[in-house]
Amino acid sequence: MNKETSKTVLVPIDGSQNALRALDYLGLIFGSKYKLKVILFYLLPSLPPILIEESKKIDKIARKLTELEKKNSTMAQLILSEGKKRLLDKGFKEQAVETVFQKREVGIARDICNWSENMRADAIIISTRGLSRLKTFFMGETANKVLEFNRSCPVWMVKGAVRRKNVLLAIDNSQNAMRAVDYAGFILPGTEAHVTIFHSKRDLKRFMPNGLLEEFPEFQKFWKHKAGEMVAPYLKKAKEILIKAGLKEDQVSIKLVDGSESAGIDILKEVENSDAGTIFLGKRGCSDVKDYSMGSVAKKVLYQASDMTVCIVP
C-alpha cells in the first residue's frame, strides 16, 4: 500500500483528559506529516425516554427539553473544538481534522462501530478510560463491546500515557495473524516506528503438568525445535510483507524466543525489551490452541497493558 494514501481514523472523545490521550497518541505515532484524516466523534448523552414522552404532552417540559438539547449540542461543540485544537497545536492541518456529534441511536459501542463502517475508517482509536462518574464509552465495558461488535475495522486501545513509538507485532502461523501483518504494512509506512515481529514458542507446560515433563526432557527439546521450524517461514514472510509495503529494512526486525507458560506474559515482557509502545495482535490465532485470540492471549494483554496501545486486528 502506498504510504501516500490518506488513512481515515475515527477517534471517539468525551471531554475527559484521559480521552484526549488518544489524540496525544496520534501525534506520537503518526505525526502531522503523515497523510491522515481524523474524525473526532462525540455521542450526545441521552435522556430517559419517559422525559421525551412527557415533553409531547406538556409544553413546559417540551420547552425545557429543547433548551437542554441546545446546551447539550453547545457542550459537544466545545469538547470537539478542544480536541481539534489539541491536534492543530501538534501540527495537524485544519482540513485533516473533522468533528462530528450525534444523538445515540442503538447504543454507544454499536454507534461507534456503525459510524466507522459507514465512513470506511481504517482505524478506531479509543482511550479505555474517560469520565468515570458518568461511565461514558471509554470505560472498559463499552470499549470491550466495541471490540466485540466491530467486524472489520482494527481497534487501537490506548491504555494510559504512551510515550514510545516502536511497535511489537506478535504473530503465530495463522491467517488471522497474517492479517495483522497486512494491516501493519498498510498503516505503518510513513511513521518512524521500528517494528519487531515477535513470536514466543509455546512451552509444553501449556499443554500438560510440569511434573510429567521433567521425566521426558527430550520432548521439550524436540518441541522447541519443531515449534521454531514451523513458525520461521511466517516470520520471514511477515518481514517481506512489511518491507514491500514501504517500511525500510532497518525498521523491521524478527525475534523468536522460547516461551513461558503464558504467551501474554511473553508479549508484555518483550514490549519492554524492544522499547515498544504499541502491540499489534490478530483478534484470533491458531484455531487449535487459539494463540493470540480474544478470550485468551489478546484478552490478557489488554487487561495487563499499561501506558501502551494495543491494536486488535479482526
What feature does the model see in each segment?
Residues 16, 45, 104, 131-132, ...:
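Residue-level marker for beta-strand->alpha-helix junctions and adjacent short loops that shape enzyme
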Residues 26, 83, 112, 146, ...:
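Aromatic/hydrophobic pocket-lining residues that form π-stacking "cages" and hydrophobic walls in ligand
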Residues 69-77, 228-232:
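Glycine- and acidic-residue-enriched helix-capping/strand-helix junction motifs
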